[in-house]
Amino acid sequence: MDSSTATAMTAPFIDPTDHVNLKTDTDASENRRMGNYKPSIWNYDFLQSLATHHNIVEERHLKLAEKLKGQVKFMFGAPMEPLAKLELVDVVQRLGLNHLFETEIKEVLFSIYKDGSNGWWFDHLHATSLRFRLLRQCGLFIPQDVFKMFQNKTGELDMKLCDNVKGLLSLYEASYLGWKGENILDEAKAFATKYLKSAWENISEKWLAKRVKHALALPLHWRVPRIEARWFIEAYEQEANMNPTLLKLAKLDFNMVQSIHQKEIGELARWWVTTGLDKLAFARNNLLQSYMWSCAIASDPKFKLARETIVEIGSVLTVVDDAYDVYGSMDELDLYTSSVERWSCVEIDKLPNTLKLIFMSMFNKTNEVGLRVQHERGYNSIPTFIKAWVQQCKSYQKEARWFHGGHTPPLEEYSLNGLVSIGFPLLLITGYVAIAENEAALDKVHPLPDLLHYSSLLSRLINDIGTSPDEMARGDNLKSIHCYMNETGASEEVAREHIKGVIEENWKILNQCCFDQSQFQEPFITFNLNSVRGSHFFYEFGDGFGVTDSWTKVDMKSVLIDPIPLGEE
């Protein structure tokens, strides 16, 4: 490796003060609003170098990983108590190894589901809760009534449970898989949250205290699995009963998957800098954030097509979003939208050069993705993409009309449009196109089914909670918080708490959709869940997507850039 490459490889970030935003001819001659986004902190020379200089996994590590996989498969087949089997599944999943042991995990969970009547988990809070969570995660329905045994005569959870921190933590995590109307689980969530908050600082076992603090910050069901795996590998290493075989395999596999992701990042970065979209002063330059989101949705190496096309469509989508939000006039946006509806370039010469560039990038990339899908999957997806883009741009157009007309819609009207304008119907449809069984299956996503409706609505509301202050400062469209304030006269604090409550309720509906949506199977159900988890990652503490130099860069660097040290072997 030469010195210039070495320099690039050691500098994933750039100094934003060194960045020069290029302006187009229309920027220079017209008074347009600007997004006021800070320049990307990611060094695109470094990102491009990952295509050829990603973390190479040594041959000896590949051989060791295969050996360890065999040992873990033996663990799954060995005689053990049901609770021990559940705990093995839980650790394997949290370490990010479930993609290696899908068959073994299903066999364990189906076996435990069938044997549920023997009652080995009765009166054991941790066992009951873990069994409930893992089986529901797998799509196997367990009723909330299994927790009735922990209630007292008045129907409330017994105070004796407060002494069982491990059991309370399992109950807390299980409660987030509840459905709307499952009051026992609602009570369990409130009960466990209250007592874990009061107890965690006094927990003597450091590993358990760390898990409790982590869970209270955000429950496992709402976390991105790939990011969680990176955190859990480090946390698991500190546990007294840590299994060294699982830990070693988790580290090796994490680095092996990361190497695959890095090669993809490098290739995508090379494409992105050729588009010219990274030079637009008013728009976000967020390729790596888009990749992180695609990785949140579908990190398994076998979903390469889904990941790459989500990034390509998503990166262009972000710029289109910014064009509607802050750049285009209403007349220009109407012309842009009508051109999308016709899927035609005939009228775009009437647009300013910047919007022509954006339209052609959207048009060409979508058609390229369609051709790739035709080649790799054997069916024509372009009509599906066109429908999704039309729906997308019409939602942007409506928000622009609200803004330019000074109109604040009621929350319900805003939400129905906002669940489309957030962009996740388009991105999830992109992911679905990459895994669909055949061309006929593409009809399932139009009109928007409940699974996509509620996952997209959740992402919209979570986005609004995190981005409202920044977007209002930029002069962007109103958000759900402000619609609710205008509709009800509530304060911002009350409105924010209301939207948080709506998020919790819609998570319950989405949980149920995962069982009700018989027309969709895995992995698309998990794609939808993971898209919402990605929203929690990027927006839980602010705008971690639009503001690149935020708390998210630490996790992104640890997941996408830095391999886990393997230590002595």
From Swiss-Prot:
InterPro entries: Isoprenoid_synthase_dom_sf, Terpene_cyclase-like_1_C, Terpene_cyclase_plant_C1, Terpene_synth_N, Terpene_synth_N_sf, Terpene_synthase-like, Terpene_synthase_metal-bd, Terpenoid_cyclase/PrenylTrfase. Mg(2+) 2 binds at D321, D325. Mg(2+) 1 binds at D321, D325. Its EC number is 4.2.3.-. (2E)-geranyl diphosphate binds at R284, D321, D325, R460, N463. The keyword Calcium does not apply. Keywords: Lyase, Magnesium, Manganese, Metal-binding. The keyword Signal does not apply. The Asp-Asp-Xaa-Xaa-Asp/Glu (DDXXD/E) motif is important for the catalytic activity, presumably through binding to Mg(2+). Belongs to the terpene synthase family. Tpsb subfamily. The oil-deficient phenotype of this species is not due to the absence of the genes encoding enzymes for santalene biosynthesis. This is Probable santalene synthase. It comes from Santalum murrayanum (Bitter quandong).
